[in-house]
Amino acid sequence: EKYSDQISLEYVDLLQNPSLASQYEDVQIGDIIVSSGNRTQTLTAYDLFNIESGSYYGSYIASSKAEQAMTSAILNVTSTKQIQVALLSGHGEQTMEGLNQLLQSNNFAVSSINPAVEEIGEEVDVLLWIAPINDPDAQVLERLERFLSENEEKTLLYFADTTQPQLSNLESFLERWGIRVQSNSIIETDNRKIINMNPYFSTSQISNLTLTDTMTDTSIPFARPLEQVFESNMELNTTVLLQSSESASVIPYGISDEQLENWTPEEYGPFPLAILSEKSFEDGKSSRVAAFGSAVSLSDSLLSSGSFCNSDYYLSVLNTLTHRENVISIQSKTLGGQELGLNTAQVFLIGSG
């Protein structure tokens, strides 16, 4: 009320006003009801905080998400349209609960689709395919191609992972869109650029700002390198979005610790870590496939980290590709101290200052 005459705030005692409880489903004492017209959303205390379990103190409040929960609820009851995001399932995909919460908190409607047994509806705007381990058959890929080719302004975001086996059918599908996923792992050879003393864990460089504002320190750890099959081919055009450092190299799968000690880099970066392919239609609209080399970049810890901008980056990608305007991105606020997530060079610089 202090900052906007469009919002009113009222405190209600359910004990004195029991009729209010009958108007809303499962409302309890302490809940927050956000209402606009005939649309409502109820928030509980668990919606306002991230709860974690510790070995010494049991469950505790790790961070506050009150701002994102309240803002999301207001957007949900006032927005005329939600972007529909569907997670592809049925092929051993990884589950990222933190990603689901981030999307829902930023007013995306999230569902699940198994393309092996059902068609992809026209109401879906974005498909997310996170590190499947089983190769899809021709019918699944035909449904994906139909979704992207017969409907304008549709998007598929694919996330690879170093634990995946060879997926010949899926990889051939991506190559037709100009994206090749290589069967190697990115490893950083410059100790000053690695994080937590892990050569597979370093920050990436944003090589194209089309989908983002100016950002730094997006982490794409445990990544597979990508390759542009072509820059332009008929109605398809590809763009590198993220890349490794120039000192990064690639290492074969399955190498032992002993072999790693004697391993010598033969090729250096930068290597593409994210590639966008756009298919243009005659009316100027397009559909898109974007591939990312790391499913780990969607992990709960990186999306909620204050040291990296992974959540900001992926929200910006989704907002831009779906033409969402006048949106705000809100992440959880950690209560108390937090690790800085510095690379080795930054640690030495601070330590010598």
Task: List each language-model region with its residue ranges.
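Short, surface-exposed patches at the edges or C-terminal ends of soluble domains, predominantly
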Residues: 1-353
